[in-house]
């Protein structure tokens, strides 16, 4: 088992406000990990640093053994918390775009998932329901052969039926030697598929542990443990 993500004593500030305070975090290959914390806890900043959207001048993050840069952008596949595609784009346009942008994009896998979800390639993003537009974004993200997949609030405004479909996409696409990091407030929807959970508060990691261990030691579900920690 190899280390996919490594953060060591990572600190990041916006002016005088500290967003992350000496964060150390390792994610191993083959793991599905939940990242949980209230708004303003540092989740978004951490994701932006991992994806290279903002820069850590001290280079305290590595993905697949590489410092954040062009090489890591090629092995990190990221889905933001909002659908990022223009409404006048057809689904097929997005397939073409991903095929051009990413050498590791598996178009056949993406098209197979579209059929399973009853989404047509000629459909316009703006004509799809919010749930279906979210599904398209996630299946495109998961159709790359990446080392680390990051989904930020994949269930944002999505109904329970659509959430179930999105979870099936996640599980059906992630390779065994990759890692999947999911940041969501919908803990109950993902608890059963998680190997590990990371709780973050005020820029600090409260704990990073096996979900099974948390249940066994607390006698509570992960969602209940979260409520206890952050009430």
Protein language model features and the residues they cover:
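The feature captures the beta-strand-to-loop junction immediately N-terminal to the Walker
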Residues: 36-38
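Helix-to-loop junction immediately C-terminal to a conserved catalytic motif
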Residues: 51
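Conserved ABC transporter NBD signature motif
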Residues: 58-72
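ABC-family P-loop ATPase nucleotide-binding domains
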Residues: 81-136
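Catalytic Walker B motif of ABC-type/P-loop ATPase nucleotide-binding domains
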Residues: 149-153
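ABC ATPase "signature
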Residues: 208-209
């Amino acid at each position: 088992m190899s280390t996919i993500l490594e953060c060591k004593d990572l600190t990041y500030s916006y002016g005088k406000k500290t967003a992350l305070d000496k964060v150390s975090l390792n994610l191993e290959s083959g793991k599905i990990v939940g990242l949980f914390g209230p708004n303003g806890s540092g989740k978004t900043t951490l994701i932006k640093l991992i994806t290279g959207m903002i820069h850590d001048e001290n280079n305290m993050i590595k993905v697949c053994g590489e410092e954040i840069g062009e090489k890591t952008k090629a092995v990190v596949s990221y889905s933001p918390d909002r659908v990022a595609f223009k409404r006048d784009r057809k689904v097929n346009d997005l397939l073409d775009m991903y095929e051009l942008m990413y050498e590791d994009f598996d178009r056949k896998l993406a098209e197979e998932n579209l059929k399973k979800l009853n989404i047509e390639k000629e459909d316009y993003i703006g004509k799809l329901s919010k749930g279906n537009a979210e599904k398209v974004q996630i299946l495109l993200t998961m159709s790359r052969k990446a080392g680390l997949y990051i989904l930020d609030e994949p269930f944002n405004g999505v109904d329970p039926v659509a959430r179930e479909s999105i979870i099936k996409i996640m599980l059906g696409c992630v390779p065994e030697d990759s890692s999947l990091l999911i940041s969501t407030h919908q803990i109950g929807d993902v608890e059963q598929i998680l190997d590990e959970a990371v709780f973050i508060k005020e820029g600090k990691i409260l704990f990073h542990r096996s979900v099974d261990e948390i249940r066994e030691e607390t006698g509570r579900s992960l969602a209940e443990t979260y409520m206890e920690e952050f009430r």
